[in-house]
Amino acid sequence: MTLLESVQSPADVKRLEHGELAKLAAEIRSFLIEKVSRTGGHLGPNLGAIELTLAVHRVFDSPRDAVVFDTGHQAYVHKIVTGRQSGFDRLRKRDGISGYPSRAESEHDLVENSHASTALSYADGLARAFQLGSEQRHVVAVVGDGALTGGMCWEALNNIAADPDRPVVIVVNDNGRSYAPTIGGLAEHLAGLRLKPGYERALESGRRTLQNLPVVGRSLYTGLHAAKSGIKDALSPQVMFSDLGIKYLGPVDGHDLRSMEQALSMAKAFGGPVIVHAVTRKGNGFAPAENDVAEQMHQVKVIDPETGIPTKPAPKIWTDVYSDELVRIGAEREDVVAITAAMLGPTGLDKFAAAYPERCYDVGIAEQHAMTSAAGMAMGGLHPVFAVYSTFLNRAFDQLLMDVALHRQPVTVTLDRSGITGDDGASHNGMWDLSILGAIPGIQVAAPRDAVTLREELREAVAVDDGPTVMRFPKGSVIEEVPAVERIGGVDVLSKPASDERSEVLLAAVGAFGQLGVAVAERLAAQGIGVTVVDPRWVVPVPQAVLDLAARHSLVVTLEDCGRHGGFGWSLAAAMRDQEIDVPLRDLAVPNRFLQHASRDEVLSDLGLTEQDIARRITEWVAGRLTPVVVGNGRGETATGA
């Protein structure tokens, strides 16, 4: 049995001698490289958090002491030492463990935090609850991968600092990066701390000297530490934290277990809020990750565990098409600028940044700021393009509504990973964007179906100069073209019955579901059911051409890869009522529930959003049986639509 196999709980880690910990860390590093190479996942961040996480579990008592990770993707080692090693064979796959903390998996996971910058607010609330209940429990917030660039962290710090007795230990896992190198004034400040370790040595020397004094040593040290303002400016560059009233320890080598344990033990003994600044290296111990200058293997597909090279050639994806077209637009229009919230590569802006570095802005994990900054740029005569994952748009809704749309500013927002993303689970599905966007007056939203329409609709979006535009597209591979047979009022007709056949059903297939809609129509044609398939192209507001076509059919069906509530079908139904178009409408979309991690195809199959299931439902509806039909594989999740 390996040392790692003997570890099934934090108590097992506590029992190990210091000499055994280095061996355990090495075994965990090999385990992560082997397992994540086979499944894909967040490899770099977790290789950099091994010793830090082991130290947390040796000093604190999870689950009695609450351990919260921010960002949640750096919690793999936490999962390993809390009894979930066997689950890594199916990491981020159906019936396997989540890539983020999961309350369903373990009592050690309090928070399913896969959106960044939230841990300190959770920690503040948990600590308040422990204080109110007179419970002697600590909260440990492990904050890393650029999360401190998010505004929520500073709102939380302001509250945590207000109570000198609040039992919160904040471990800053400072690897200098989110996906790419962390940017901004805070990043520069932390870099300065990394370069000036003298304060830690001075503080530790003073602690040892004073605590060795009989009787009064500990009290004297505590008093001097609390009143050290006269000397701290001479010794420490971390005034920002100390002036908030939060004690600071560091920088500490985050890969030195003994140093990390000492720092965490001191923080625990202090009582009250303490920051432990741990300096780590993303991808530590795996040469391919350390040598990956761009992202240090932040997130990988299936790779060779020796070389780090993907085992399969990467297909052309939606992000690639978007990235290339934005560069071409940038060459034609000097007023077009690009904004990202700490995701330059993942959102495809890396090529734009390389071509026009002075016109590309990475604002850190700060979607709210990004949106309002974009409004300001538009007021100044620029046309900003804010590239963001669909799931992170939720954070900037108020800014899009009040700062962009209310002022009718020409800002284009491009939503990558819209619809079902699959393996990252409930928090990363982009199924809420149309529900959010449909409530904003004056906004226009496009949903391309292929590479050709993505290029076309992106250009149409940046041509709008009197209000905000949005373009949504999914994760994954993209086909070059789903051809249209004609365009009517800006709406593409993708297929229709032969001239001598009657079209009974209008099938409006949104975005990437265009190809699926055509396949459904072909299947129904073989059964004698005439179907016209249209791609609305611009889904908000509802195109008049779709309404005109709806009035000429016996049944309207909408098909979309987003939430039903507030989706295109929902909006089309309202518009049909407004225009007194008395034709039945059935909307096939994602039900209003959180969806667990699985592949995109598996999730769509569960929801009945497959060619066979959709055709069967339409057949039943045409036959007059308009009651709900349970489809899918019996897991209890089905697309709504009756």
UniProtKB/Swiss-Prot annotation:
Assigned GO CC terms: cytosol
PROSITE patterns named in the record: TRANSKETOLASE_1 (PS00801), TRANSKETOLASE_2 (PS00802)
GO molecular function annotations of the record: 1-deoxy-D-xylulose-5-phosphate synthase activity; magnesium ion binding; thiamine pyrophosphate binding
Top-level enzyme category: transferase
EC number: 2.2.1.7
Binding site for thiamine diphosphate: 73, 114-116, 146-147, 175, 286, 367
Reaction catalyzed: D-glyceraldehyde 3-phosphate + pyruvate + H(+) = 1-deoxy-D-xylulose 5-phosphate + CO2
Cofactors demanded by this protein: Mg(2+); thiamine diphosphate
UniProt xrefs under InterPro entries: Dxylulose-5-P_synthase, THDP-binding, Transketo_C/PFOR_II, Transketolase-like_Pyr-bd, Transketolase_BS, Transketolase_C, Transketolase_CS
Binding site residues for Mg(2+): 145, 175
Cofactor stoichiometry and binding remark: Binds 1 Mg(2+) ion per subunit.
Pathway where this protein functions: Metabolic intermediate biosynthesis; 1-deoxy-D-xylulose 5-phosphate biosynthesis; 1-deoxy-D-xylulose 5-phosphate from D-glyceraldehyde 3-phosphate and pyruvate: step 1/1
Keywords: Isoprene biosynthesis, Magnesium, Metal-binding, Thiamine biosynthesis, Thiamine pyrophosphate, Transferase
GO BP: any one term: thiamine biosynthetic process
Family of this protein: Belongs to the transketolase family. DXPS subfamily.
General function of this protein: Catalyzes the acyloin condensation reaction between C atoms 2 and 3 of pyruvate and glyceraldehyde 3-phosphate to yield 1-deoxy-D-xylulose-5-phosphate (DXP).
PANTHER family linked: 1-D-DEOXYXYLULOSE 5-PHOSPHATE SYNTHASE-RELATED, 1-DEOXY-D-XYLULOSE-5-PHOSPHATE SYNTHASE, CHLOROPLASTIC
Subunit annotation: Homodimer.
UniProt-recorded name of the protein: 1-deoxy-D-xylulose-5-phosphate synthase
Biological source species: Saccharopolyspora erythraea (strain ATCC 11635 / DSM 40517 / JCM 4748 / NBRC 13426 / NCIMB 8594 / NRRL 2338)
